[in-house]
Design a protein with these regions (language model features):
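Active-site neighborhoods and metal-handling regions in enzymes and metal-associated proteins
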Residues: 1-184
């Protein structure tokens, strides 16, 4: 990324928080994307902002990119609110768009997996499938909680662990800098 303004950093960070929130969700089996969508939108909603697209859609194999029945959206759509099942891949892509200004969208793919089973039922979770570092130069930690920073640090650690074995030494040095742990 090139230089970013303070305002762009504020929104970049809010959208990033939404991406991290949704990717870290733990939820009971039976939930749909409508139940979880607020996790991605909440940082923007707290600012009185929103984005006018679904937060995510099902992703098939063989490049069948928009494949249902799974999705994340804030609005109930008849026939379009499937229960999130183990093995479903869904995009996690909140955004923010300023007319005559700038746009931001972070996009990860997340895999739905079974988590622990308790007397309350089967819990589910997501696993990230996308491993690309977020640009620290565009992030303003003043708009993040300690929990947000910890989530981002865990994500960046996973990026380094998954990607670095395939890189040259110079590329590893670059990736190490982009994924190094930061403090609030």
């Amino acid at each position: 990324m090139g230089p970013t303004t303070e305002e762009e950093k504020k929104y970049f960070t809010a959208v990033l928080r939404g991406t991290l929130n949704l990717g870290a969700a733990r939820f009971l089996h039976g939930c749909t994307g409508v139940n979880l969508d607020i996790l991605a939108r909440q940082p923007l909603w707290e600012m009185g902002e929103n984005f006018k697209h679904g937060t995510g859609h099902g992703v098939g194999y063989l490049l069948n990119v928009h494949e249902g029945p799974n999705s994340f959206r804030w609005k109930i759509v008849p026939g379009g609110n499937a229960v999130l099942e183990e093995g479903m891949i869904t995009s996690d892509e909140p955004g923010y768009y300023r007319e005559d200004g700038f746009g931001i969208r972070h996009e990860n793919l997340i895999l739905c997996l079974k988590d622990k089973k308790t007397p309350y039922g089967q819990f589910m979770r997501f696993e990230n499938l996308t491993f690309v570092p977020f640009d620290w130069d565009a992030i303003d930690v003043r708009y993040m909680t300690e929990s947000d920073v910890c989530r981002l640090n865990r994500y960046h650690k996973a990026v380094y662990e998954k990607i670095s074995p395939f890189l040259s030494e110079d590329e590893k040095i670059w990736l190490e800098e982009k994924t190094r742990e930061r403090l609030k």
